[in-house]
Structure formats: C-alpha cells, structure tokens
Amino acid sequence: AAWEFIKNEDNPFELAVINPALVIGASISGDIGESNKAIAMVASGKMPVAVPLMFGYVDVRDVAAAHILAMQNPNSNGERFALVEKDLWYKDVAKLLIKNGFDKAPTFAVPVWLAKILANFSKELKLTLPYLGRKRSIKSTKAKEILGWNPRPAEESILNIANQMKDLGMLK
C-alpha cells in the first residue's frame, strides 16, 4: 500500500522499507515480546525437543540502527531492506544455550516426520507445520552495502535475552 501511495501521489516523500526477520533482544520493560518467547521456550525446557524449524534472527537494536541509517542515506529511497544476521535451526539455538549454562534446553532434535506427529498435541507446533524442515535464506546484502549496516552476532542477542529472562525469573 505504501509503494502504491507513493506512485499514485507523484512521490510526495521518500520511502524506504525495512523488513526484519525474527526480531529478538533484551527488553527495556518487563514485556519480553512475542519473538523472544521462542527463545524462552527453548531456554526453559518448555520445548522438550528441538523441532526442525529455522528462523532468521536480528537484534532489535540493529533494526533500530537500520531505520536511522535508512533515514540518513539518500540512496535508500525506493529500496526495500531485508534484515537478518543469521539463520539458525532450533537445534543450534538449543546447543548455544546449553553451552552457556541453560541446561533445560533440549538436547534431542526430532526429524520432520516426528515433529508433524507431535504437532497433533501442541497448538504452537501445529502453527509451524508449513515451515518444518524448510531451510530459509534471507540475505541482508543490500542493507550492508547501501546503508553500511553491521549487525551484532545473533548468538550474542540470543544469549542477551536468555540471560535477561533468567535474571527476571521468567525461565522456570
């Protein structure tokens, strides 16, 4: 709709679109947000097995930085920027968390066929059925080249939010 408006209104202003992947990172309030809940489920052991799901991760601070960079860069006009630092499977997130002291994270990864069976018993998992086993590959090349965007490692962001949730007593 925004692109259509710009086109139909004879370019009344500049427009750049920022499309982040799964936005994660420490919260400035007690509300951890929906995206971080996926990390909480893995870190707390509420996800007893690592299902074959892959997500692209990007830190909320890096999304904010990309917005500022786009506003400051005239070359961003008319561009769409995908933002992702890294694509990770849940099993990789679980391994990272276990390595850093979150011993409730799942140690066993299930294959797609078993995850599909398990989805019959979990409404959250049932929502992911179309994405099970699908490898994603979002590239942020344009944001890096045009905006000079340089995101922090996804692993750092995952550990930041996991540690914050642990400190707040949210991982039980």
Protein language model regions, located:
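Active-site Tyr-X1-5-Lys
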Residues: 1-16
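Glycine/proline-rich active-site loop of Rossmann-fold NAD(P)-dependent oxidoreductases
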Residues: 10-13, 25-38, 70-80
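Conserved SDR Rossmann-fold cofactor-binding beta-strand/turn motif
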Residues: 19-20
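A conserved pocket-lining segment of Rossmann-fold NAD(P)-dependent short-chain dehydrogenase/reductase
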Residues: 23, 29-30, 36-62
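Glycine-rich Rossmann NAD(P)(H)-binding loop
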Residues: 25, 50-53, 81-88, 98-99, ...
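Mid/C-terminal beta-alpha module of Rossmann-like enzyme folds, strongest
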Residues: 66-126, 156-172
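Conserved C-terminal active-site "lid" loop/helix of NAD(P)H-dependent oxidoreductases
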Residues: 118-150
